[in-house]
Amino acid sequence: MKRIFGIFIFLSLLLFLVPLLASCTKEKQVYIVYFGEHKGDKAFHEIEAHHHSYLQSVKETEEDATSSLLYRRASSINGFAAELTPDQASRLKELKEVVSVFKSDPRKYKIHTTRSWEFVGLKEEEGEDYRSDGDAPRHKYDVNDRFRVGRKFLKNAKHGDGVIVGLIDSGVWPESRSFDDKGMGPIPESWKGICQTGVAFNSSHCNRKIIGARYYARGYERYYGPFNAEANKDFLSPRDADGHGSHTASTAVGRRVDGVSALGGIAMGTASGGASLARLAVYKACWAVPNKEKYATNTCFDEDMLAAFDDAIADGVNVISISIGTVEPHTYLEDGIAIGALHAVKRDIVVAASAGNDGPARETLSNPAPWIITVGASSLDRFFVGRLELGDGYVFESDSLTTLKMDNYAPLVYAPDVVVPGVSRNDAMLCLPNALSPDHVRGKVVLCLRGYGSGSTIGKGLEVKRAGGVGMILANSRDNDAFDVESHFVPTALVFSSTVDRILDYIYNTYEPVAFIKPAETVLYRNQPEDSVYPFSSRAPNWVDANILKPDIIAPGLNILAAWSGADSASKDSIDRRVLDYNLDSGTSMSCPHVAGAIALLKSMHPTWSSAAIRSALMTTASMTNEDNEPIQDYDGSPANPFALGSRHFRPTKAASPGLVYDASYQSYLLYCCSVGLTNLDPTFKCPSRIPPGYNLNYPSISIPYLSGTVTVTRTVTCVGRTGNSTSVYVFNAQPPNGVLVKAEPNVLVFDKIGQKKRFNIIFTTQRYEFTGEARRDRYRFGWFSWTDGHHVVRSSIAVSLV
């Protein structure tokens, strides 16, 4: 009887679940349907009709087809975005001419979140000596000479005047002084864009600096529902409510603004973009997630970003900067940024994108497509330092932005020891809201742990303040991880986890432990490596195709001072009410616009250079050493390798005259795509019967996975600069990876005119090598090769793994 009853229950559940499962398979989601490149034989309205016919072929009614459509792109990008069931998407994928169909996902992308331009040699006015207490600068060369070279470069590049930089991000705060158009000339005649109005944004917010602005929210609203200003904490317009877009825009092309600083006067100085006279076109495609804290999350949809790319191309931008990337790896045909960038590059628009903030783990980088300039993050020679002093005389130098002062030494306690009754010690250890007992915290310094997913660091400081504390020591969860250095509400010292043991030992073995936290100071040339790769910067190998070495380059991304949104606080935390005009932020999001600004300058100097030529110039002239002429270090003090820094740290002034460039056309990228199985991107291009390997794309670096025996790699260089009227003779040199013999045929290249091309082979051969420890067979090893004529050094990174 029990068995019969069990069968009855099972059948009942089955009958209930079958319709439910069936309904799930019919659930609509937004998909992007991509057709590759246009054939060129259809008018705009014919392309739209063509798209509609495909959509209607899987829809039951005309009304359903029309209502499901979000975007229909026909100017540069060939495709549409629509609500589809999984079955409808699958049917479309099988149709002729459809290149890819992929699902939109709000969790797919995330935003990758002064002194920095001086650091790379671009300073407009006469520079200071940067001497401290009369001591000579510790650099091994004349800093002012570097600034003179930088000023000449800026003058020759006309500060980017005439170049239009498109920024796909969270919008712009147009009232910022960084976007003032005073003294700027007429808008370039090549500009075809618009100034789209919306909430708190009208046509008067565009000017001769912000020459255009648009916003894209159809994908966002289709997923989250109609826009609700209170829940969304955003503006349905190009106006920036986050700060990220304004920050990246002003870093790339902001005007020179004197006397700016972060909260408390930290980083006081001049804020300026790299190309201060370049024009800005804003494409807002990223938004706050409803009812979520801005510091914790944001979202950008494929369909919205592809629409932004399509408009930017049609509007006439010269450069696109996009500090956004996927959370998880995706193939090129499932990555809206890769697709949009390929169409941009076809029209010689240079695209720079951030590498991501998921380092230091391997295979974490975003934007790995070879037609994108992928930018990692380095530190600066400027630090914000506070001092933590314990009662036993022990002193810690601490990262800090807090300028608040303690009156004197105060009792020191560990957060779990001052917990509110009934609250877990873990919550107290993380200094979560209402976890600390005012009776035991009042007048004391509290040691808290940072944790992950445990609330904002600003919130921890507020909890200490709520409980009456006078200072906070915030310890990281693991050594060498990056700190978000923020301006807290109580005097705060940030320490690594290795320091915690020393502090706890003092607390528990001292009768009355005390601590004193000194306010933060701005320090230049601190006694630690500058120009190093920061731990959050994402790393190779390139999981989409290991034949392409990424990132391409690194640029400053730590504590960058730039414009901010007046609708957001310093920390992006809703409990933080402090509003400011300029803010410090860190991430590869900040590195990317540095390179975008440099690209704008190079575009101004060399308007006929292709996107690939500009990338090559930046990569092959990058610096191998830091300011002390020592190899650039990784976050842990070890020498950084190309998986972390690509071709190393960018030097815009050197990139202006690279000598030789590795050029690549749109056709070159299509041929490369054949090697990764993408054979139908362009109906006018057919893959050859013998497809060359991916490492033969004419790229300024070389990556060979699984080298066995001998591999020959082919490259072509183009002469873009000569010394005088004489013939230029370039000689090959190499530092080969361990266990690999590297030689070039020919090993001398002779050029007698600008524009001349020379082809050469580089032959890689494995040698007898003992693989032990870190040099196991599955490990990559690194090197470089160069061509030099005595004036130019054209250097390329090498990454090889042996089998």
Curated annotation (Swiss-Prot):
Disulfide bonds: none annotated. The active site is at D169 (charge relay system), H244 (charge relay system), S589 (charge relay system). The keyword Transmembrane helix does not apply. Residues 140-656 form the Peptidase S8 domain. GO terms for biological process: proteolysis. Residues 1-22 form the signal peptide. The gene is SBT5.5. One of its GO terms (cellular component) is extracellular region. It is found in: Secreted. This is Subtilisin-like protease SBT5.5. Residues 23-112 form a propeptide. It comes from Arabidopsis thaliana.
